Regions:
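Glycine-rich flexible loops
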Residues: 1-474
Length: 474
């Protein structure tokens, strides 16, 4: 009896965890009602993994939707495992892999519609022995480049539940954490379901950024080539040192009101795609020497998140994000800070810098941009609410991330433009003089500003509409 209870309790824990992942995927519309699948290795029985049933509704999983399957291939239970169970089984045999997720993220799938004759987002690698085209997607943003790196994209004669998928996808995921089936969607593997979700979320963020950059007239192929030729450690000015998701993160804060304040912002940023899950950061200054810091700015509902007290003075092992928070608190009167991957705002910042200073600013880091009070780049809103609240948003190039001195122009941008600065190719840094709410408002506003600008730009180019500049505040 006790043994049966342990087995039942273990299966229930697995179900709740997979249910949480499925709900998180549905929140960002990464699947239709019944598409995609996810699996997880049984942490107790090494011969068993669990997978969502064929035809199950990923955003509303019930216990019967989680099907246990032996690695030997014999399954049991009331429901039938996903049609891609064999693919999951082979991927889960890779050392260190405990979970696989396949989802139909819109932007991650959209970038896959390239051909060997025309590439908008991908680098053509060649064809295999069966003349199937193979490509590589390389993120051009700092977070994507370091979190996931290059992602292989394969074309398939039958891209759903086929024997060629069973053969090639596990092979691709033996070499990388992600792969994309052209026209179908990405697969991710992870040491946990949470980590697999993190990789998919970052891929979607980087894909969205790449699409908006391309639609703004920026040749991302040149940027991708430069990154791959130089290597990311030479191309980018800093290493963000992004770590894996900790399934049981450390939380030092017990105050329910503080926890709820952070949770609301984290959940909102994830749902609205203002940040990729597990990236970014947010904090609140509680004294001249201390702050409460969260090493994420986007987390799905019902997920745990890290929260700790830390000193405002620099420490040797500080991450890039943490150093930025400390730099801001040391040199401004701001009392809250949020860093969000913000794909649209980050892309718009890159496009504006390229338009004003040439493509070199995105390629070689040799272009020097002035950051004088009377001469510096900005992003100008065109929508009424943003113009009323903040008629300019600060903008800097990514090289400023290497400067941790009081002369960093990010600080002046936050002073001059009501606590909002876009770091092109990295993130939006938003702050508040009093509450975390103010920083959250700035982050959300920056993403909407970029969306309006991009859509009007597309209307101008495709529909002969008025130019963006017509609506910019004078």
């Amino acid at each position: 009896m006790e043994s049966d209870k342990k087995i039942a309790d273990n299966r229930h824990r697995i179900f709740k965890r997979m249910q949480k992942i499925g709900t998180a995927i549905s929140f960002v519309n990464a699947n239709n009602t019944h598409s995609g699948n996810l699996s997880m290795r049984d942490p107790v029985d090494p011969d068993v993994f669990y997978i969502t049933a064929s035809g199950s509704q990923g955003g509303h999983l019930i216990q019967q939707d989680i099907v246990p399957i032996h690695f030997s291939g014999v399954s049991w239970g009331d429901a039938r495992g996903s049609t891609e169970s064999t693919i999951h089984r082979e991927i889960l045999k890779i050392p260190g892999v405990n979970s696989v997720i396949h989802a139909h993220y819109m932007h991650s799938t959209f970038i896959s519609f390239d051909t060997k004759d025309k590439q908008l987002f991908l680098r053509f690698l060649g064809t295999d022995s069966h003349e199937r085209e193979e490509f590589l997607f390389y993120p051009v943003d700092l977070i994507g480049a370091y979190s996931i790196g290059g992602v292989k994209v394969g074309s398939y004669e039958q891209p759903v539940g086929s024997s060629e998928m069973e053969e090639r996808i596990p092979q691709s995921l033996g070499e990388s954490i992600l792969t994309i089936v052209r026209g179908h969607g990405p697969f991710a593997r992870g040491s946990s379901p949470e980590n697999a979700l993190h990789y998919l979320s970052v891929l979607e963020n980087s894909s969205m950024l790449a699409i908006f950059l391309r639609r703004r007239g920026i040749d991302i192929g040149r940027i991708q080539k430069s990154i791959m030729d130089l290597g990311k450690n030479k191309f980018f000015p800093v290493n963000p040192a992004i770590s894996e998701i900790n399934v049981t993160p450390r939380c030092e804060i017990n105050d329910p009101s503080i926890l709820e304040d952070f949770r609301i912002k984290l959940n909102y940023n994830y749902r609205q795609s203002i940040g990729a899950f597990g990236t970014g950061s947010m904090s609140h200054k509680i004294s001249s020497k201390e702050m409460i810091f969260c090493s994420m700015s986007a987390v799905p509902e019902n997920f745990e998140f890290p929260l700790c007290r830390t000193t405002i003075s620099f420490q040797e092992d500080d991450s890039l994000d943490l150093r930025l928070h400390k730099l801001i608190y040391q040199n401004t009167h701001q009392n809250s800070c949020m860093i969000t991957s913000s794909p649209l705002a980050t892309a718009e910042g890159m496009a504006i810098l390229a338009e004003e200073y040439g493509m070199g600013v995105l390629l070689d880091g040799g272009t020097k941009i002035p950051y004088l009070a009377e001469d510096h780049p900005v992003v100008k809103p065109i929508d009424g609410e943003a113009i009323y609240l903040n008629p300019r948003v600060g903008l800097v190039d990514m090289s400023q991330l290497a400067d941790m001195t009081p002369d960093n122009p990010i600080l002046n941008m936050l002073r001059w433009y009501k606590g909002c600065c876009i770091v092109a190719g990295f993130a939006v840094i938003s702050t508040g003089e009093a509450t975390l709410e103010q920083a959250a408002h700035n982050a959300a506003s920056a993403e909407r500003i970029a969306k309006f600008r991009s859509e009007v730009f597309i209307n101008e180019k495709l529909l002969d509409g008025p130019a963006v500049e017509v609506f910019e505040p004078k």
